[in-house]
UniProtKB/Swiss-Prot annotation:
Family the entry assigns: Belongs to the polyribonucleotide nucleotidyltransferase family.
First-level EC class: transferase
Gene that specifies this protein: pnp
Subcellular location as annotated: Cytoplasm
Protein's name in the database: Polyribonucleotide nucleotidyltransferase
Disulfide bonds: none
Binding site for Mg(2+): D486, D492
Subunit structure: Component of the RNA degradosome, which is a multiprotein complex involved in RNA processing and mRNA degradation.
GO biological process, one term: mRNA catabolic process
Length: 710
């Protein structure tokens, strides 16, 4: 066992790549370490493609093991269960930049597994996993046009760009961006920002690509020293004769079909033509398979649509390259929801609903770094009917999780701070129609639904999806792409933001050669489109409603002395339980004495506040209270006049005349009016019944000395 180790400096940290010691039966395996973070990345490739398979079966699995942080998993079974949202999102993050680098026609199954085996809880292991995947593919010998590099980029006005910031640095950073690419090209960007201008965002992409060159060089050197022989794989030769025949027979008809603006009608026509092509060419005599005909038919579609776009001809739905589809906005569409919006852009539609909950509705996430509370949830649902199909209904898929997180990133920067608006927020985007850019429709709909619910957003947010078609004779950047343009194009570029700047940016590029100029043009067009969409949204709802929805819970925050917390909670929680049950409210108390009270309506809220106020209230000298006699003694009576507070009415303070026997005047359980005369240094309270009665009657009693309590 002779492991080969490659070390290199990456920013202010040393990265170690090791192969040949662990997982030696995998096609490629690399243990990557950055500081105390270690991720084992393995790649296995099937030697042959499955018969009849017409797609590339790449699967990426990122998994975080509890032992990496010195923890034992919770739950009954005490072992890791289904992938968390973080693991799913990181799996997608690794998948996206490597998928376009496998050669065209390579259909062998490839499985990537990245296992976090150690973490210092100070930095996200995702960058280490991406670097390790690149290195494992590089040494595996599997056909792969890499290696790739990956970098996380932060930004502050004081420091500028920050390479691979820690969790602590990200707390003050205005940007959290992950960039991945090859030596010559950026392939993937995933980011969230606090309304940063386009030039800062583009600069971050270029900075990340420049810095990751150290990673790419190290992976290439590791492959040179420890790599396996590259597979002797050749793509199946294209049947040029069949391709020419299909083009001659169906080229014009396909071109006409792509001038049908209605998606369903266009798909029906293309389906008919595809079936005709299969019937004509996939015969027993020819020996040509139906899959081969369908594949070349798809290639013909691809070439026809792209050539028209580059030639600046009208797009599939008749638009030019910069026009946004017609937009329709409705808010308040669901009467009992706290906030709702129906956002329609062309044939893409999202019904988005916002719900306000109390502090106890937060999502508690168990992760390697410890327990995290998430007070803003955004869930994206993509039912099969949205594209006119029957499909599987079940657990949330990776795509839905990824689109939901992108929409969440777009909106998160404009949410109010928890201190001023301590609601838990849940937004659900139901995609009811889809023809491209449903995640960006979710951003627009989420902004509108939150404003409709009365959530005080800093500014409205809109999102737009851009596309690119690049050929040898030129390129075209497309605004507001359709589903077909996404599928047939070279880039998917999604930007969300306000009038002031970008809040989220996601980019996936399928080809090399995307220049700084192209990205700059795409960002400029996206800005113009975003401002147009915001203008359409503002015609219906330009700012948050002045108050939260009548259907939403009411809340108020009060501050009490921390010593009073135990009084509100009571013995075994009896007091707080009594308040919440009797007033139908929810109470959340922080250790610093911050009390958040939630109730379904103002009446219940006020009742709960009154109960709390009475418990924490201090006796005020000179104030008159109504109390209950709780105990009679020879020298007077003890009266409970505030929750948890009793005071002494001395025998001389019961009546104007001389009182010989207290029981002749008072009984236990009797309700009386008392006036607070004094509170001594030991907190003992002196009360008077006769002064309370005299003050209410408007006469001043004769002055008498008040005896001390014995």
């Amino acid at each position: 066992m002779n492991p080969i180790i490659k070390k290199f400096q990456y920013g202010n940290q040393t990265v170690t790549l090791e192969t040949g010691r662990i997982a030696r039966q995998a096609t490629g395996a690399v243990l990557v370490s950055i500081g105390e973070v270690a991720v084992l990345c393995t790649v296995v490739g099937a030697k042959e493609a499955s018969p009849g398979q017409d797609f590339f079966p790449l699967s990426v699995h990122y998994q975080e093991k509890a032992y990496a942080a010195g923890r034992i998993p919770g739950g009954y079974f005490k072992r890791e269960g289904r992938p968390s949202e973080k693991e799913t999102l990181t799996s997608r993050l690794i998948d996206r930049p490597i998928r376009p680098l496998f050669p065209e026609g390579f259909l062998n199954e490839v499985q990537v597994i990245c296992t976090v085996v150690s973490t210092d809880k100070k930095q996200d292991p995702d960058i280490a996993a991406m670097i390790g995947t690149s290195a494992a593919l590089a040494v595996s010998g599997i056909p792969f046009n890499g290696p790739i590099g990956a970098a996380r980029v932060g930004y502050t006005q004081g420091e500028g760009y920050i390479l691979n910031p820690s969790y602590k640095q990200l707390e003050t950073s205005e940007l959290d961006m992950v960039v991945a690419g090859t030596k010559d090209a950026v392939l993937m960007v995933e980011s969230e920002a606090k309304e940063l201008p386009e030039d800062i965002m583009l600069g971050a992409v270029l900075y990340g690509h420049q810095e990751m060159q150290a990673v790419i060089q190290a992976c290439a050197e590791l492959a040179r020293d420890a790599g396996k022989a590259r597979w002797d794989w050749q793509p199946v030769p294209e049947n040029t004769e069949l391709k020419t025949a299909i083009k001659a027979a169906f080229g014009v008809a396909i071109g006409d079909a792509y001038r049908i603006t209605d998606k369903a009608e266009r798909y029906n026509r293309l389906g008919e033509l595809r079936s005709e092509a299969v019937a004509q060419f996939a015969t027993e005599e020819s020996g040509i398979s139906a899959d081969a005909v369908k594949s070349l038919f798809g290639t013909l579609e691809y070439n026809i649509v792209r050539s028209r776009i580059v030639a600046n001809e009208p797009r599939i739905d008749g638009r030019d390259n910069k026009t946004v589809r017609p937009i329709t906005v409705d808010v308040g569409v669901l009467p009992k929801a706290h906030g709702s919006a129906l956002f329609t852009r062309g044939e893409t539609q999202a019904l988005v609903v916002a719900t306000l909950g109390n502090a106890r509705d937060v999502q508690i996430i168990d992760q390697l770094e410890g327990e995290k509370k998430e007070a803003f949830l955004l869930h994206y649902n993509f039912p099969p009917y949205s594209v006119g199909e029957c499909g599987r209904m079940g657990s949330t898929g990776r795509r839905e999780i990824g689109h939901g997180r992108l929409a969440k990133r777009g909106v998160q920067a404009v949410l109010p701070k928890a201190e001023s608006f301590p609601y838990t927020l849940r937004v659900v985007s139901e995609i009811t129609e889809s023809n491209g850019s449903s995640s960006m429709a979710s951003v627009c709909g989420s902004s509108l639904a939150l404003m409709d619910a009365g959530v005080p957003l800093k500014a409205p947010v809109a999102g737009i999806a851009m596309g690119l078609v690049k050929e040898d004779n030129g390129f075209a950047v497309l605004t507001d792409i359709l589903g077909d343009e996404d599928h047939l194009g070279d880039m998917d570029f999604k930007v969300a933001g306000t009038t002031s700047g970008v809040t989220a940016l996601q980019m996936d590029i399928k080809i090399e050669g995307i220049t700084e100029e192209i990205m700059e043009i795409a960002l400029e067009q996206a800005l113009a489109a975003r401002l147009h969409i915001l203008g359409e949204m503002n015609k219906v709802l330009s700012q948050s409603r002045t108050a939260v929805s009548e259907n939403a819970p009411r809340f108020e925050t009060i501050k009490i002395h921390p010593d009073k917390i135990r009084d509100i909670i009571g013995k075994g929680g009896a007091t707080i339980r009594s308040i919440t049950e009797e007033t139908n409210s929810s109470i959340d108390i922080d250790d610093d004495g911050t009390v958040k009270v939630y109730a379904d309506d103002n009446e219940a809220l006020q009742a709960a506040l009154n109960r709390i106020g009475a418990i924490v209230a201090e006796a005020e000298i000179g104030a008159i209270y109504e109390g209950t006699v709780v105990r009679i003694v020879d020298f007077g009576a003890f009266v409970n006049f505030l929750p948890g507070k009793d005071g002494l009415v001395h025998i001389s303070q019961i009546a104007d005349e001389r009182v010989n026997n207290v029981s002749d005047y008072l009984k236990e359980g009797q309700v009386v009016k008392v006036k607070c005369l004094d509170v001594d240094q030991r907190g003992r309270i002196k009360l008077s019944i006769k002064e309370a009665l005299a003050e209410e009657a408007g006469t001043a009693p004769a002055a008498e000395p008040v005896a001390d309590a014995e």
